[in-house]
Amino acid sequence: LTPPAERVSEPTSDPDIEVRTYFARGRNALIARGDFSEIFAAWYLHRMDHGIEIPAAMEDPAREAIASITLHSASRPWKEACAWTVKFPEPRLNVFAAADNHTGSVIANFQTSDLQPIGEGMFYADVVEDAKPPRRSVVDFREKSFLRAVEVFYSQSEQRLVRFFWHGEEDLVMVAAQPDCDEEWLAGLTQDSIRTLDRDVELSLLEKRQFTFRCGCNQERMLDFMSPVFQRQADELFHGDPSISVLCPRCGARHILTREALEARTSKPSHE
């Protein structure tokens, strides 16, 4: 595959990337590709802004989570939003990633402390599409790599083969089986064959989509998030302090909430 073309969209306040999807003629496979350098840089700055320290062992799984869920989302319907929670047993680690086609947003978070031991990896996939009821799939796995765990999820839940390949440090390629796919060809793909894929296979461009690392959490949303807890156990929550620090469960951003603000929020009539 040759390098992706320069981004053609107008610049925004958040760095965005372009993901392209192709159809491999004669092989009946969908190919999605993106250069994630801008999103990885935005994720790094997000961590610096909020004092989020990431263990060295977390760097690769988190990057793989951000990139793979973005490519997965780019291959899905426009009205669909998806979220993955992936639990690794050893080392004990939870990785969360979400992507929304409607907003073009991608986020990720992780947890390494206060986790119960588990015997095998667990992959939870949640999907929301327009007004349809949310759907959840749960798959167990034994792989150590996040990308291999996604491949197991596709095999067991989606009932089709998918492969992931890094084309560079920040350039990921996904090849997913479609109906009547040449699965022997797909299973036999290697790092070297990915480099010449556009010369060996006829590729037809399907779509271009834009994605940005952005959560959307803010003070108002965190007040709504914490209000039910405050109503049940306000004193236990604050321990006499005028404010508390709350982490967004989706992106790990730190928000300072005052008792006064929560009291004002919970005292509002329900119709307001």
Segments (PLM) and residue ranges:
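Interaction interfaces in information-processing and related assembly proteins
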Residues: 2-206
